[in-house]
């Protein structure tokens, strides 16, 4: 099984020559070229999700962090010929994970998107967790990881788990040790 994580950079008008409209073809070609079984995507807006669905060969799960269907979010792309989704969900990395919310020290709302999958040739389910942790506060990153461990405790205990994403942290930071 080949897996990847990819921060595709949010679509923003401030990027000028690096706007999504100029990058989307190359990003989708790259994703298709590597023929991953599964790829976790960060910093994706609804228009980018539409493009990923239209121009890649993958099935796409997605969730956005504002709770209004318009904001930045996460996606999990998977190849249905290799991987089957069994269950999926998402929650906020905050003190109220089941409703749109923000950690008090975070720069913006953050979410975790998860999926329970199995390979089409195997019968063993595995858990995939996609995150994009806070870019401002180390404490918010730790708190976010704690929420993930609490919300998915039973699944993590039961299934092999892949935690993927953009941690916004250096390799020696405490968030990598949880």
Show which residues each predicted segment covers.
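Structured beta-strand-rich core segments of catalytic domains in phosphoester-bond hydrolases
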Residues: 38-125
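N-terminal, active-site-proximal structural segment of metallo-dependent hydrolase catalytic domains
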Residues: 1-55, 65-72
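Active-site-proximal beta-strand elements of phosphoester/diester hydrolases
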Residues: 1-14, 86-91, 114, 124-134
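Catalytic metal-binding/acid-base residues of hydrolase active sites
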Residues: 9, 45, 132-134, 167-170
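Short, Asp-centered acidic motifs that coordinate Mg2+ and/or phosphate
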Residues: 1, 37-38, 126, 160-162
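Surface-exposed cleft-lining segments at the edges of enzyme active sites
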Residues: 12-16, 93-104, 131-141
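Metal-dependent phosphoesterases centered on the DNase I-like endonuclease/exonuclease/phosphatase
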Residues: 127, 137-178
């Amino acid at each position: 099984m080949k897996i990847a994580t990819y921060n595709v950079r949010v679509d923003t008008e401030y990027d000028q020559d690096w706007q999504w409209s100029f990058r989307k073809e190359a990003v989708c070609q790259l994703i298709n070229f590597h023929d991953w079984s599964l790829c976790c995507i960060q910093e994706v807006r609804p228009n980018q999700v539409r493009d990923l669905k239209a121009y890649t060969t993958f099935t796409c799960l997605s969730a956005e962090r504002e709770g209004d269907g318009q904001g930045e979010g996460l996606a999990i792309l998977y190849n249905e010929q290799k991987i089957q989704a069994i269950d999926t969900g998402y929650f906020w990395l905050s003190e109220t994970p089941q409703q749109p919310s923000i950690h008090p020290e975070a720069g913006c709302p953050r979410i975790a998107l998860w999926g329970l999958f199995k390979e089409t040739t195997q019968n063993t389910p595995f858990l995939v967790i996609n995150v994009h942790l806070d870019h401002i506060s180390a404490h918010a990153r730790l708190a976010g990881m704690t929420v993930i461990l609490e919300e998915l405790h039973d699944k993590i205990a039961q299934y092999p788990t892949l935690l993927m994403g953009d941690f916004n942290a250096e390799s020696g930071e405490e968030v990598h040790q949880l």
